[in-house]
Regions:
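TRNA-recognition modules of translation machinery and tRNA-sensing kinases, especially anticodon-binding
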Residues: 300, 304-307, 323, 327-338, ...
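Class II aminoacyl-tRNA synthetase-like tRNA-binding/catalytic domains
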Residues: 96-336
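Short, Lys/Arg-enriched N-terminal segments with co-localized hydrophobic residues
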Residues: 83-94
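Hydrophobic alpha-helical signal peptides and transmembrane signal-/tail-anchor segments
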Residues: 24-27, 38-46, 54-62
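Short hydrophobic targeting helices and cationic amphipathic motifs
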Residues: 6, 16, 30, 35, ...
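Metal-assisted phosphate- and nucleotidyl-transfer catalytic regions
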Residues: 270, 348-454, 480-498
Length: 537
């Protein structure tokens, strides 16, 4: 056994390159047939100039030449290079590597709409959405991730036989692109063949290929994995994706850092009885009502943080606006001058997101018949003033001075739409009695807090405000509430060691989506709702 430096050639992405390897050579001193493995070596490639390690390769050399330059006849023996990078030596593949590059074989609707493929043969993947058999010709509509595509099947020309195709079969169609104004996308594919990738074993229990499914919400939810294949149903969740995308993009642009807080804890951030309790390795635990404590902790780390994640509320409500699990869009920001900074940040998010939906989700909005709300300016009104306005305008008595009843929220939304043509309104300075212990009281009137709700067409979609950042003030507030600090030691720790003035909010994603789309039930805009009666699917 001896150490030997040897010059070698390697082929990477089809380019012949000269490299150097070194390693221990196990040499055979006796004749070995060409078909046998003559040499086994463990080598590593290095950059000749910097000696930087570039790869570690286990080589199995075939044949009887083990040193020196490769013979010319060997250099020509390399196998064809596929889309994967391969190492060759002596004309043989040693191993291949993933490079992150994919070879595009099929096209998308957006590719065809660019005009590049008109009159050309293409491959396109999709599920058979609907088949309209017209005799010698059939229209096979495919459902793709970008929408519906009409393909033309010609008897005697297209393969396989039409009877082999069925709705919901996954296929790859091969055909020529032709302009057709009457087709869903303004073009059609004149099919040469359909490759059937898979076929269903049972017919659909629900007519998902109709523009509007004529069925109840409960049936749609029972069959949710299938009902979501309806193009209008899935369009709702494309819009919802746009909302979350807007939330992330806008806050990133404002210097926020995304965090991921735990959803199992020892206690709830909001207190109260609306907690889901569970056993956690012989300990008591709860599902997170909110990421509130963790958001505040992370303000001391990053100044500005946000999270889009599920929260859990064990509230026994059975209404069109309540869920027991929903997605909360939360942010918390430090070094604020006023709780109005938080409202301004939310206004900026809404403006950015509506523009994003208008430009990049126009197809879905048109399909759903949505007109986006106005967010140029959002009015704000004090809690007590809002109650007075509604009572006076709509001849309604104030029954609960400490909170807004659902009917009052609706009337506040109606009032500002009628008087100011406003779709949103901030209601500020909620009573301290109805806000959590960490809410900062208004120094001018401690019966009220520096907090707010955002109403959208009369429905609360956001709760937020400024938090207490002074340790002693927080201790006093906890004592005034008759609470104990037990179980909150880590939370209180951040205030002992200094926190900046800060505040934040939480937005209910499903509620916001519901109001944007004009739905009247939050379950319509929840992928798989969890409520009093539903744990499946």
């Amino acid at each position: 056994m001896r150490c030997r430096y040897q010059q070698n050639e390697r082929k990477y992405d089809g380019v012949l390159q000269r490299g150097w390897y070194r390693g221990f050579i196990f040499n055979a001193d006796f004749p070995v047939p060409d078909s046998a493995i003559a040499v086994l070596g463990l080598f590593y490639f290095t950059d000749k100039e910097s000696s930087r390690l570039t790869s570690l390769v286990l080589f199995f050399f075939m044949g009887d030449t083990v040193s020196g330059d490769l013979p010319p006849e060997r250099r020509q023996g390399a196998a064809p290079v596929s889309k994967r990078a391969k190492y060759y030596t002596r004309g043989r593949i040693i191993m291949d590597f993933m490079t992150g590059k994919t070879e595009k074989k099929t096209v998308l609707i957006s590719d065809i709409l660019s005009g590049e493929y008109e009159g050309k043969e293409v491959l396109l993947n999709g599920a058979v959405h609907k088949i309209r058999d017209m005799g010698e010709v059939a229209f096979v509509v495919l459902r793709t991730r970008e929408g519906l595509v009409q393909t033309v099947y010609e008897e005697g020309t297209t393969t396989p036989e039409l009877k082999e195709l069925c709705e919901e079969a996954a296929v790859t169609v091969k055909g020529t692109v032709a302009l057709e104004e009457r087709a869903p996308q303004g073009f059609e594919i004149r099919a040469v063949s359909f490759e059937i990738l898979s076929k269903p074993v049972e017919p659909m229990p629900i007519a998902i290929n109709k523009w509007k499914m004529n069925t109840s919400l409960e049936t749609k939810l029972d069959l949710r994995p299938l009902s979501l294949r309806n193009v209008k149903e899935r369009a709702k969740f494309r819009v919802q994706e746009g909302i979350v995308r807007g939330f992330r993009d806008y806050l990133h642009s404002q210097g926020f850092t995304e965090i991921h807080s735990p959803k199992i804890g020892a206690r709830g951030a909001e207190g109260g009885a609306n907690l889901f309790r569970l056993e956690y390795f012989h300990k008591h635990a709860v599902l997170a009502q909110s990421p509130q404590f963790y958001k505040q902790m992370m303000v001391g780390v990053f100044d500005r943080v946000f999270e889009a994640a599920p929260v859990f509320r064990a509230e026994k409500h059975n209404t069109k606006r309540h869920l027991n699990e929903y997605t909360s869009l939360d942010f918390e920001m430090g070094y604020i001058d006023s709780f109005e900074d938080i409202m301004e940040m939310e206004t900026g998010f809404l403006q950015y997101t509506m523009k994003l939906l208008e430009t990049e989700y126009a197809k879905e909005l048109k399909m759903l018949g949505v007109t986006l709300p106005k967010v140029d300016e959002i009015p704000q009104v004090r809690f007590d003033k809002a109650k007075e306005l509604v009572a006076e305008k709509y001849n309604r008595k104030i029954r609960n001075p400490f909170d807004l009843e659902p009917e009052e929220e609706s009337l506040i939304g109606q009032y500002f739409k009628e008087e100011m043509d406003a779709d949103f309104v901030f209601v500020t300075h909620y009573p301290s009695k109805k806000r959590p212990f960490y809410a900062m009281d208004d120094p001018e009137d401690t019966n009220y807090t520096l907090s707010f709700d955002l109403l959208f067409h009369g429905l609360e979609i956001t709760t937020g405000g400024q938090r207490i950042h002074d340790y002693l003030a927080l201790v006093d507030k906890i004592a005034d509430r008759g609470m104990t600090q037990e179980g909150m030691e880590q939370y209180m720790m951040i205030f002992k060691h200094g926190m900046p003035p800060h505040g934040g909010l939480g937005i209910g994603l499903e509620r916001l989506t519901m109001k944007i789309l004009g739905e009247d039930n939050v379950r319509e805009t929840t992928l798989f709702p969890r409520d009093l009666s539903r744990l499946e699917p």
